[in-house]
Amino acid sequence: MSAEPSRNPRTPPVSAVDIDGAAKRIAPVVTPTPLQLSDRLSAITGAAVYLKREDLQTVRSYKLRGAYNLLVQLTDEEIAAGVVCSSAGNHAQGVAYACRSLGVHGRVYVPAKTPKQKWDRIRYHGGAFIELIVGRSTYDLAAAAAVDDIERTGATLVPPYDDVRVIAGQGTIAVELLEQLNTEPDLVVVPVGGGGCIAGMTTYLAERTANTAVLGVEPAGAAAMMAALAAGEPVTLDYVDQFVDGAAVNRVGTLPYAALTAAGDMVSITTVDEGAVCTAMLDLYQNEGIIAEPAGALSVAGLLETDIEPGSTVVCLISGGNNDVLRYGEVLERSLIHLGLKHYFLVDFPQKPGALRRFLDEVLGPNDDITLFEYVKRNNRETGEALVGIQLGSAVDLDVLLARMQGTEMHVETLQPGSPAYRYLLL
């Protein structure tokens, strides 16, 4: 699924000149990140595929670029009043690092459910210049507390994406990749959350290249930019899947939306499901040794679901690498489901000896494994329900497995990914 903005160009909120200026401002602090050719992705697509490694940025994401570009332009009065942001992730770390670098005091509001290791990283980057304020239960409440703060204290709010200084800062990634590539790419693939990064990069590429196209990639469960383009304005999503947390926003920024509509048909938006993102994460780790967070792997996941012109030059932005190692169990699970290797069933077992053994002998194939078995014995009933997870040796074995199940006396219900029962019992 993809969508394109209006083909009636408008004036973007920032310009290439603004972005060039931002590149000069942030140069003392921001690390130029590598642009690396991926032999694997090049072989798969038939194109020359490069990875722009913002996961190797100082705070392990591109967010420092926009935060620093905003803070470095504050007036003396604004510096004295300090800055405020609300974030549970990369934006907070970028703001914290920029505050310490410039000697600006800041307050970061984070939801109470934020993992402690993220608190620790924010404190590490900000040092004595950052006050971490924890307490509100959700991000929306933390954001509301930040707004209350600036109204009460006169501090400057540092938005994660809906600010021209932030957009210009994120756009410096495009400045860098053009210098490193030394030619015009045919396609640049960018993850999309609130839209600040794709807005800045698209604006710069629109002015500084002749024929470069931009593909924005959103998680299917948080497709806020696609919804905005379809509606003709930013809209608020009723539900957002939080798994790809770095891109899980319910409404894109007004300024990023304006930048994309101004770019016309050079930019398009596509979505990928969260399982494809997990598969891309694991492939990047196992093949390139890249530890990408879910949002950081969006571009590669989108690339692999897009028809690419053989012989073309493509750049994929790996936007961040702040991943929690404790999430890898869920990452692997979602990837196996996406690849058709993991399936779940509700099975009514006869409550008599040998029922499980018969299931193993009659239903399971030689390369299939039971990965989950939760059984509840019922008194005064002839059958008992079990939740059964099966991992196949190959995705093509599913039809054979289902046929064997139908040939038994047991009633079997396949749980479909995305259904309410599936989400309740499993993910």
UniProtKB/Swiss-Prot annotation:
Stored Pfam families: PALP (PF00291), Thr_dehydrat_C (PF00585)
Keywords: Amino-acid biosynthesis, Branched-chain amino acid biosynthesis, Isoleucine biosynthesis, Lyase, Pyridoxal phosphate
Gene Ontology BP term (one): L-serine catabolic process
Record pathway: Amino-acid biosynthesis; L-isoleucine biosynthesis; 2-oxobutanoate from L-threonine: step 1/1
Modification N6-(pyridoxal phosphate)lysine, positions: K63
Catalysis: reaction(s): L-threonine = 2-oxobutanoate + NH4(+)
Cofactor(s) listed in the protein's UniProt record: pyridoxal 5'-phosphate
Domain ACT-like: 343-417
Signal peptide location: none
MF GO annotations: L-serine ammonia-lyase activity; pyridoxal phosphate binding; threonine deaminase activity
EC class name: lyase
Disulfide bridge positions per record: none
Superkingdom, natural source: Bacteria
InterPro entries: IlvA, Ser/Thr_Dehydratase, Ser/Thr_deHydtase_PyrdxlP-BS, TD_ACT-like, TD_ACT-like_sf, TrpB-like_PALP, TrpB-like_PALP_sf
The protein's assembly and partners: Homotetramer.
Known role: Catalyzes the anaerobic formation of alpha-ketobutyrate and ammonia from threonine in a two-step reaction. The first step involved a dehydration of threonine and a production of enamine intermediates (aminocrotonate), which tautomerizes to its imine form (iminobutyrate). Both intermediates are unstable and short-lived. The second step is the nonenzymatic hydrolysis of the enamine/imine intermediates to form 2-ketobutyrate and free ammonia. In the low water environment of the cell, the second step is accelerated by RidA.
Family membership noted in the UniProt record: Belongs to the serine/threonine dehydratase family.
Protein name in UniProt: L-threonine dehydratase biosynthetic IlvA
Record organism: Mycobacterium leprae (strain TN)
Phylogenetic placement of the source organism: Bacteria, Bacillati, Actinomycetota, Actinomycetes, Mycobacteriales
